């Protein structure tokens, strides 16, 4: 897209107030403009043909046609970057996760009270998400190729990264059985950070993990409420236990702990055990939870026992913390540009010098397991 051309945005929402607020926020930005608004998907279909927008904002729940039904048809017939506008309810969060699964790039949570003030408070975030969506790589919803062999050499893996153009979709039933791999230590940890596009990337990564894998701590940029539904969704799909982190609980093998929305997640120590720590200290890199907070705590408390993974996302959160992890002895992997929805956080982590290996998403899980095995962190039987 020509950088001098403004990002063309079409807003679809049954609330006249939301349409008005979004129009004000978007048109106030120097690099984007609203080319149309629609109260429902039926009217939006004609406007899409007329205006050919770069990005859509789409309400989840609307009359005449549900936002998810419309999104599914859109991604099949006319793939377009979409930012969902979602309510802060359990139903809204579950619908949003489904939208991200269908191909939406990101979402904005509607405030429960004070709609205009609440939306305007996040004007910069809304604009950033639209910018990220405009340059995002949409995920084709097609059958995936078989994952590359887990034991691929680093040189081969980096070479392969340049040849991958789409992130494979994995079915839980298709993940290889874990019976041949047993982890011999509970002291090793996998530390993961992600943002835009991360919900699906995290799902694909966790689907590769066997029930006896090291404990996994995860920060995905999400508001409060959404992480609860996210953890429940993953727990129903994966062979490991996935849960929202609780302050002070012991980190166990075969478990993944997701940072709650609006809470920083850190790795702590209690005697010989690793524990989760939560706090509401100020946002870092404009985020709470922040990936840098988790990564830095892993550098302090786990050192070489940690293996870091940074996945798709906009911005630079995690880059400084990943370098600290590397300097403390951790081995770190970044998702490659071709398989990222937005190549921001991995790019910054690479630029900072904190990354050992750059891999396409479908190779990261197998590579992590192979790395743990090769360094005595797992035993194969």
Swiss-Prot record:
Gene Ontology MF annotations: phosphorelay response regulator activity; protein-glutamate methylesterase activity; protein-glutamine glutaminase activity
Query: What are its E.C. numbers?
Result: 3.1.1.61, 3.5.1.44
Tell me where it mainly resides: cytoplasm
Superkingdom classification of source: Bacteria
Q: Which GO terms describe its biological process?
A: chemotaxis
Indicate the enzyme's highest-level EC class. hydrolase
Q: Which Pfam families match?
A: CheB_methylest, Response_reg
Q: Which residues form the active site?
A: 195, 221, 317
User: Per its UniProt record, what InterPro entries does this chain match?
Assistant: CheB-like (IPR008248), CheB_C (IPR035909), CheY-like_superfamily (IPR011006), Sig_transdc_resp-reg_Me-estase (IPR000673), Sig_transdc_resp-reg_receiver (IPR001789)
The Response regulatory domain is annotated at: 8-125
Record SUPFAM superfamilies: CheY-like, Methylesterase CheB, C-terminal domain
> Record's family?
Belongs to the CheB family.
User: Which NCBIfam families does this one have?
Assistant: PRK00742.1 (NF001965), PRK12555.1 (NF009206)
- Record-given protein name: Protein-glutamate methylesterase/protein-glutamine glutaminase
Report which gene this protein is encoded by: cheB
